[in-house]
Amino acid sequence: MNMLGSMFSMVKPRLDDLGTDRLNYYYSTLIIMGMSLTITARQYVGSPLQCWVPAQFTKAWEQYAEDYCFVYNTYWVKPNDKVPLTVEERVSQQLIYYQWAPFIMAIEAAFFYLPVIFWSMLSTKSGINIIKLVETAQKAEGAESEERKKQIDIICRHISNNLRKRRNEEETTKMAKIQRIFGMQHGKYITNVYLVTKLIYMTNSFLQFYSTNKFLGQNDPYWGMRILDDILKGTDWEHSGNFPRIAMCDFQVRVLGNLQRYSIQCVLTLNMFNEKIFLFLYIWFLLVFFVTLFDSIFLCYNMFSSHKLVEFLQQFLDNQDQDENDEKKPEERKVYRKEQHSILLSEFCLHKFTPDIIILLKMINNHTGDIVCTEIVGRMWNEFLERDAKLVLQRFVDNDHHMETKSSSLKSEKLFEEQRSFI
């Protein structure tokens, strides 16, 4: 109980998440911990099972029998079937899950939270303080004009410094090997760590689904659908055997030096809760897995498609208002927008933004909305036009001229060869 209480206080929404992350590390963890606490309270505050004992049993004997049966398992027999004669047959039909259910759920909740710990530990080594920058963006969202400009400047300066650092710095820390593996020097460290975290989320939900099936002794991966179908059709557990409410229990007591064996019938009130809880978890694990899978595919498409990358940044440039920089150079701005806009936009999006910066912008956009991101991208666009636009356009003209010269040279050589051939 203390462990679950401390986990409840530790699990909080984070500012460095996207899409389905919160569904995994936050909502799943809290939901499963809540279920674990519910079953724990039912087990240790109420009566987990009650047994029908022989009339000669005293109150102490009855309590002993119920405690023994709760600890050492029960076995299920269909109402119209005979009780198995051999111990081996009875053991093969044992119900071994109900007393362990709250502990298994606590472990499941912990495993849903582990991936975000992995993400938190490695993402902080990138040089980009994502949480701090998102907090700054949130301050800018609700600030007045001057304070807003100041907060936006802080974010833009941090991004620019990170871009310069990635180009010029050779990593020499203890994390250097891990950072190289995850693409630190190419501005892909956060992106790769984040995608690995997504993979861990999916692996976790799939393994949770598989291990829960094994824990319940179900060899059919569709058992959840069968139970749901039984509930909807009104099929009684007495016929299906799913989470039986009544089970048998065998125990021995020593009376006057002799061992006497008793077989008693017990009511498993816990299984009323277990049936609904594990059916919910069956559906939940599948839902989380597929939602995370589709979200990861969608993210990869948006991150590694040049078209979607340009489209992502273009939406903010389209939203931005004309600032003082536009008013100072209206003619130049107009030329850029009409004639060379595609060249500059392509250079700006594909070469001035690393995947890590794109992930950062997506997280800022996720927690603050379009307005702050519009100002950040707009500010960086205007700085790009001031500092790099002429150089980019000149390089494009030079390359174009070089290609024309090369094409003319090839044509001349071809004509010369044709003339030689004719002669």
Swiss-Prot record:
Segments crossing the lipid bilayer: 25-41, 102-122, 277-297, 341-361
Expression sites by tissue: Expressed in pharyngeal muscles.
Cellular component GO terms held in the UniProt record: gap junction; plasma membrane
Keyword Membrane: yes
Chief localisation class: membrane
Keyword Heme attached: no
Subcellular location(s) of the protein: Cell membrane; Cell junction, Gap junction
Membrane topology according to the record: Multi-pass membrane protein
Keywords, comma-separated and alphabetical: Cell junction, Cell membrane, Gap junction, Ion channel, Ion transport, Membrane, Transmembrane, Transmembrane helix, Transport
Recorded superkingdom: Eukaryota
GO biological process, one term: monoatomic ion transmembrane transport
MF terms in GO: gap junction channel activity; gap junction hemi-channel activity
InterPro entries: Innexin (IPR000990)
Subunit (UniProt): Heterooligomer of eat-5 and another innexin.
Cited function: Structural component of the gap junctions. Required for synchronized pharyngeal muscle contractions.
Family: Belongs to the pannexin family.
UniProt-recorded name of the protein: Innexin eat-5
Species name: Caenorhabditis elegans
